[in-house]
Structures are given as structure tokens and as C-alpha cells.
Amino acid sequence: MSRSPRPHGTHEPAVGVTRPFVRQSHPEIAAWPAPPPAHQLGCLSGNVRTPVGGPAPPSPVLRRAPSGPISPSPISPVSQHSRASSRHDIDNTSLLSILKLSHVARESSRNTSRNNSPQPAGRETELKRKIQTLEETVAEYERQKYNVMGTFSEYRERVAERERKLEAEYSGKIIALSEEVLGAKKDFEARMKSFQALQDKFEREKEQALEKLRKEHQKEIQVLEQRFSDTQLLNLEQKYIIEIQRLEEERKSLRTEKERLGETFEMKLRRAQSLYETELTAAKMLYTKELEALRDHEEALKEELLARQDEFHDRLQELQLQSKRSREDLVSCKNDVTALEKKLHNKEKEVQTLTKELDQVKTETNDKIRRLTEVTSEFAEYRKKFQQQEEELRRKARLLTVVEAAKEKLESVISDLQVEVKALKNKVEFLEKERENLQSQSESQTQLQSSQVDALEAVLHSVTKEKETTKEHYEGLLLKERQQAESREHAMKKEFSCKLNELEEQYTSLKEELEESARLDKDELREASEIEIQALRTEKSILAAEIRVLTQKIEDEEQDDITEQLAKIVEDTSQLTRTLEEYRERITGKDAEILNLRKQLEKEISHTEDRNRLLHENTQKELEAHKETHTETVRVLEAEIDQFKSAFENEQEYGKEKSAKIRELEAQNKTLLSEMEKVKHVAENLEAFTSDKDNLLEELESKNKNIEHLKQEIAQLNEKISTKETEKDSELEKTIAQLEIDNSSKSDQIEKLHLRVNDMLDQMGTIKDELVKKNEEIKTISAKTAQLLESNTVESETKLASVTEEREKEIQSFQTQISEKDNEVLTKAERINELETCLKEREVELTGMRTKLDDMTQQLNEETTVVLFDNSIQEKIDEKEATINEMNERLKSRENEIAKLHEEMYMQKTQNEKRNEEQSKLFQELMFEKEQLEAEKAEQSHIEAEVEQVFQADKESKWKEQIEDLENALQRKNELIQQLQDRQTDESTSEPHTKKRMSITSHGVFQNFVSQMKDKREEASEKRTRKEAEKKAEKEKEKAEKAAKEAAKELAREKSPARAKSPSILTRLRDRSPAKSKSDNLESTPSSSSRNLLSPFDAEKRMERSSPSQQLFSRTKKDSSSEKRPAWKF
């Protein structure tokens, strides 16, 4: 089609010049200035050539008309030679041709008026029509000019918004990637440091173990020299050498593994750095090229706009002159105006029909909004129902607190739940706000659509067929270019997602390697410790069998009543231990069930969160996709209502499941309460047992009186039995000495292993703490709504059960200690029995300590809160330490008394004449010891009462601290018992030496023995002080490290802005999905309206503000057509 305003009829075909379609560098805008064919000037040429009156002579002007401005050569002279001529030139030629035609028409009208004077009316009408067409063309030129400027500004703003969105996308993703890489690097470095520290500790422990084994080996060689031959010693040495070589090989293998891990880590770091640098350079180059192209394009657009403005000014001046001349003939145009007014009335009727349709649509939207209000009211009713259910749960919790003694715990749990309910209410309010926002958006859309309808009504008058065809053509081109841009964006996002996948795979592989190494180390350490413990247990069982044989020999001579009572006591204790083990097994089973329920709840919460996120994304997509028409927005609202209903039904089902689970937990709580009552019955049986024990003590007192009566008879029989006793005593002392030596060595080994196991458990605890911290960082994203109800109730019940068990164990330990102290008073055979009970107690303590450590580790995994010390608890701890110190002093006094007994035994051997007097002194001392033991029993009962009060009054956090204090006290007592056993072994070993050295006086022997005892006491006190100082130093170091970490965290928070944590795996997968990539809801940076992307000043500002990490994962390959195509397409 021709672009000229001149008519392209059959008489003058030269005007309709076709021009070729040329690809331009500027953006193809849908409204470049082109004169519309409002009224064709077909009548102009005919009237000029043939007048109305009749045949006239042809004028010279009319002969020149077809060869002058109407020819195709002046309109488009370049079209025959070059295809690169712009539309601007064609438009200029069309305007010039219009002006020349008007000038020629006027001259011809003047000439015809001179020649044909009797026909002025037809010429005047023709001239008026020409003037009208010219004025209409001028007005439409001005309109099209404004349209062009508006479309160009809109296009410029769209390009700027696109570029801003793309920059915001890439900058956010690149920053997140860099932060993830840095976080992974820091995690890897921290884990490498912890792994190195563990390796160093493991090597130190190995060296210490080797040194201890060497020392023990030397001791065993000294013992075995008396028993075995040289050949057996050589075989043992060879075995130890082989074991030492094996341990050294393991050490070398661990070092090689450490070096290999360091090399792999360095290689991966180098690769990541090289990739990062290459991508940075490529992104910088691309960014600079794009900036240069945009600047060039900006200059070209400015030049074109200036040229066109000048041309428009010239045209307007010429047209204004013509309009002044043609104002005289406007009166005849009123008839045309009336016709146009009729047309306007018709169009107004059409507009009224459109307004009626709009009102119908508005009524439909109001109905939909009413439906939404009804749904919200239903939601409020369901919320009230949920609140009622919460109140019922609180009542049940209060009933449980009345049944149990832990009211304060459950009240704290209920307060936490109230906080969470408030959080849930806040979430519901947030959802309601979102609904209100959606409603406001729908209203704004209706307003926008109404304004668009008004604009369309104004535009309907000026739209023509040619404009519609050009618009369709240009819109097709714009759609093609948009599709190309979307395909490019999609390709860029795919590349970015591929790189993200690679980095995540590297990170996961590193994680798995570290976790596998840690697990292997744990398994090896556990196996080694279990093997050593089993070996020690076998040796202990052998020794216990030997001791039993000796005790049977001695018990045959003594009374049988005491043995029967002790057997009953042992049976009762064994039954109690069995019941406790059964309760432990049940509790572990219930803990497993609770863990399964927690996992299920976590899965359900994750599902609900995913659904909520999907709902939110779907609503945003639907709102953005259905902005064009109002009918589509109504459909979106209906879909959203259906989705909200489905979500609400899912929440109802989830609440029903919660209520069912809560009922199950209440049934379990009832069963646990019944079991607790059974345990209370067992405790009452124990109290009955204590009453039996008091009866036994009374019987012992009566027997002591009988012993006093028998003293006289014993004095008479001492002379006869002295010879027999010396022989028996010598044999028994030898056997006891050997057994005590063996027991001391085995007890030392057990203590070393116990210390080693504690160290390993501490290391395991640190590793578990690190793993728990990482898991907590992952789990903080998910909202913990229903977990706290179930987890806190179950934890409180399990803790109550564990505390009651520990308390019963401690009561049993105190009772066994009291029985030991009672048995110490009797005879040497009773002392052997005490050794057996000590061995049994140590086994029980080892098992108890292991179970306690397991419980503590589970509690540390489940609970992340740190318990603070109260001043009242510290005061009670100080009081207990004071009581423990008093007990230590009394034990020291007992040691002195035992030393005196040994001295008296030596004096009996050396001085047979003074035995009767010494035996009387010994009986007096024994009575004094009995009185002391009774006083100690009363003190211990007082301590037990205090412990019970503490257990009943304090909370779980205080119980833990008290248990730790009691464990420390038991360890100190065990150390004192070990020292007593060492002294007994030393004294037993020193007996054969004293027999050999009978020539030395008794005074010298006594001095040597006292000096040895003093040296050992000093060594023990020094060891204690060293251990306490080391513990204090370790605690101070830990406190300093914690303070430094907290200070570093605070500094990091102050320096760095509050940014969100690294996105979870679900968010990453959602970002990679193709549906997300096509959506336009990208986070755009807020920018002022005055900012112009085409100006070089603003572009330089953006270059300065942008960080170097923004160009990390941009395209590295250049497009072949990037230099040829214009800058606005980037």
C-alpha cells in the first residue's frame, strides 16, 4: 500500500509508489507518522482536468501537472537505486507532493475562474474539500506525532524495566551462589580443623596407651618372672612387638589419608577459582560491549529525533499559513459536521451498551467477593473450633500436672504453645492480608480496564484500516522479538541452573565424604573399647570365681545366719535391677515410637508448606497472566477460592490427625503413670528392706554383747590356737596378697579404660553437637507448630522416668555403701566379701554411667537450650562438697586406723607374749569404729533426705547438675577406695620382706611403713590438685572460646546486613523449574522515575554500584549477530 496522502486511483497511477521493506536499526514502533486516507482526493484530478460548464481549452498548468510533482521521481528518487532508504524520506516526499498538488490546484482554479466565470460554485466546493483534507491531514499528523513519542517513551521504559529485572535476577542469584560457595568452604575448613584435632587427639591417646601398655608390660614381666620361664616371656614380647608394629602401620595409613584429603581439597579450590575468574572476565567484556552499543544507539536516536522535530516544525508553519487562508470557507463545512454528529450519536449508543456490559461484570465480581467473605466467615468458625480444642488440650495438661509432681514443667510447655498459637494467629492474619491485597488488586484491575475502555472510546474515532494493518505487522514483529528474548532468557537460566547443580553436587560429595570418615572413626573406636571391656570382664569373672572359692572356705567356719541374710539382700537387688532394665527397654521402645511420630509430623509440615508455596505462586502467576481481560480475572478468583477451600479441608484433616495422635499419647501417658506407681511400690519395698536392715543391726549389737562375754574364753583359748593361727594367717595372707595384687592391676586397667571411654564419648558429643547445629540450621526454615506439644510432653515423661531410675540407682548405691561399711567391721572374711561387692558395684556403676551418657547424648540431640546455673543450686552444691570433704577426712581417719591394725598385726608376729593385750586394744578400736560407722550412717541418711528434697523441688535442669555433682562425688569415693586397696596390696607385699628382716627392730619397720603411707598420700593429693587445675583451665578455655565466638558473630551481624539464609533445596529446585523461569514475578530493584537507561551518566552510575560478583555466571560465548543487531535487542 502507498503511504502518500494523495489518492491512488485509476487516473494517476504515478502517486501509488510501492516501497521495499527494509530492516532498520531503530526499534520498529507501531505508530511512525503516516497520513491516513481519511478522505481520498479522487475528485481533485477530474475536476481540474474537466471543468463543469463544458469543453474548455487545455491550460498549460494542467499539462504540467502529471509530469511535475505527481511523477514518481520526486516522491521517491532513491527507491529505484537503493533499498536502504528510510520511511522518513518517503513521508517527506508524500508531504511535499500534497503541498505541490494543493498549489497547482489553486493556480488551476484561478485560471479556470478567469476563463469560466459562470461556474464558481463547483470550484469553491472543490477548494473547500481540499482545505478540509489538508486540515485533517495536519491534525492527524500531530496526533500521530504524539502517539509516536508516547510509544517510543513506553518502549524505552519497557527496555529499562527489562534490563533492571535481569540485573536484579542475575545479581541476586550470583550473590547467593557466592555465599553458598563461601559457606561450603568455611564448613569444609571447620570440619578439616575438627578432623585434624581428632586425629591429633587420637595419636596422643595412642602414644599414651602405648606408654601405659609398656609400663603394664614391665610390671607383668616382673610378676611373670616369678611364675614363668624365659621362653614364655620371649613369646609375650614378640606378641607385643607385633601389636606395636600394627599400630604404627595404622598411624602411617591415617597420615597418608590426611595428606590425600588435603590435596583433593586444594585441587577443588583451584578449579573453583579458575572457573570464577574466567566467568568474571567474560561477564565484564559482555557488559562493556552492551554499554557501548547502548550509547551508540542513544546518540543515533537523539539525532533522528532532532531531525524529525525540525521537519515537523517546518511542516506545521506551512500548514498554519494554509489554514489561515482556508478559514474563510469553513461555513460550508457545517453540513458535514451534522453528519459527523449523527455518527457520534450512534457511537455513543454503542458506548452505552459497553457500559451496561461493564456493569454486569462488576456485579459478577461483587458476587465473587461475597463468596470470599462467606469463606472467611467459615474460616473464623473453624478457628474458634480449633481454639476450643486447644482449651481442651490445656485442661488435659492440667489434669496430668495434678497426677504428676512436675507442674512447672508442663506450665512452661503450655506457655511455649501459647506463643506458637500466637505465631499461627499472626500467620492467619498475614493470609487474610494477602486476600485483602488480592481483592484490592482485582479492584485496581477493574479500574484500569474501565480507564482502558474510555481510552479506546476516544481512539475509535482516529483508528483507520491502514493503521490497523501496520499495527498488526509491527505487533507480530514485536512478538517474534519477545519470543527470541524469552528463549535467550530461558537458555541463560538453563546454563545457570546447570552450574548450580554442579556446585551442589560438589558440596554434597564433600559432605558425604566427611560424614563417612567420621562414622568410620566412631565405629573403630567403639569396637576397640568394646573388645577391651569384654576382656576385662572375663578377667574380672575369673577373679570373682577365685574369691568365691576363698569365701566359701572361710564362711564354712563362721556363722550361717549372716550369709543367708546377705544372699537375700543380693537376690532382692538383682530383682530390682531386672525390673529397672525392663522399664528401660520399654522406655527405649516408646522413644523410638515418638521419634517415628516426629518424623511423620515433619513430613506433613513440609507437605503443607510446599502446598502453601505452590498456592502463593499459582495466585501470582494467574494474576499476572490474566491482566488483559476482566473475564479472565474472574476465573482466577474462582480458581483461588477452590484452592483455598481444598487447603482449608486439608488443614481440617490435619487437625483431626493431630487430635488422634494426642489421644494416643494420652493413653501412653496413662500406661507410664501405672508403671510409675509400680516403681513406687518397689521403693516402698526398699523402705521395708531398710527396716529389716535396722533389725539386723540390733541383732548385730546383741551378738557384739555375746562377743564381749566370749572374750574371756578367747583369752584362755588364745594360747592353744596361737600356733595354728600363725600357720593359717601366713597362708591366708599370701593368697590374699596375690589376689589383691591382681585386683589392683585389673582395677587400674578398668579405670584407664573408663577414662578413655569418657574421652571418646566427649569427642563423640562434640561431633554430634556440630551435626546437630547443621541440622538445626536446615530445620529453622520449617515452622514447628504441633511438634512442641507432643515432643515436650514425651520428653517430660521420659525425663521423669530417667530421673526416677537414676534416683533409685543412687539410693541402691548408698545402701550398698552402707552395707559395705557394716561388713568392714566384722572380720577379714567380710573384707573379702566387701571386695566382691566393690567389684559388682563398679560393674553396675560402669553400666549406669554408660546409660547416663547415652541419655545425656539423646537429650543433647533433642534439646538445644542451655541450662543456666542458679545461685541456690550453687549453694547446695557447695554444701554437698563440704559434706564430701568431711567424708574424705573420715576416710583418712579410717586409713590411719587400718594402718594401726596392720602395725598391731606385725607386733603380734614379733611379740607373742603381748598378743592378749593387743587383741583387747583391737576390739576396743573396732567398737570405736562401729560407733563412727553408725554416726556416718545417720549422716548418710540425712544426705539422702536432702537429695530427695532436691529431686522433688528442683526442675529437670537442676536435676542434671545435681546428678553431675553426685557422679563427681562417687568418682572421688572410688579414687579413695582404690587408694585403700593399693595400700592394702603394698602392705601385703611388704609382709614377706618383714619376715626376712626380723632382725630389724619393730620401731624401724613402723617408721618405714608410716613414711610410705605419707608419701602415697602426698602423691594422691598432688594428683588431685593437678586434675582440678587442669579441669579449671579447660573450663576457662571453653568459656573464652565461647565468648570469642559470640563476639565474632555479633561483629559479623553488625558489619553484614541482615540477609536471609542460604536457600533450601526445595527453593533451589523450584527456581530451576521451567514454569518458574517463564514467570515474570522477578524481584526488581526500586528505581526512581527520573532515571534514564539511555543516558551515559546513569549507565556509569550503574557500573559503579554493581558489584564484581554480578557478572559471575553470564554468557561466555559471543553471538555472531551481536555486533550487527541493534542495542535495544540486548
UniProtKB/Swiss-Prot annotation:
Coiled-coil regions, chain positions: 121-779, 805-1061
Keywords for the protein's UniProt record, in alphabetical order: Coiled coil
Biased composition (Basic and acidic residues): 983-993, 1013-1057, 1068-1081, 1116-1130
InterPro entries, per database record: FAM184A/B_N
Pfam family, one: FAM184
Superkingdom of source: Eukaryota
Chain intervals with Low complexity compositional bias: 1082-1095
Biased composition (Polar residues): 999-1011
Location of region: Disordered: 1-92, 104-129, 974-1130
PANTHER family given in the database record: PROTEIN TAG-278-RELATED
Protein name: Putative protein tag-278
Gene name of this polypeptide: tag-278
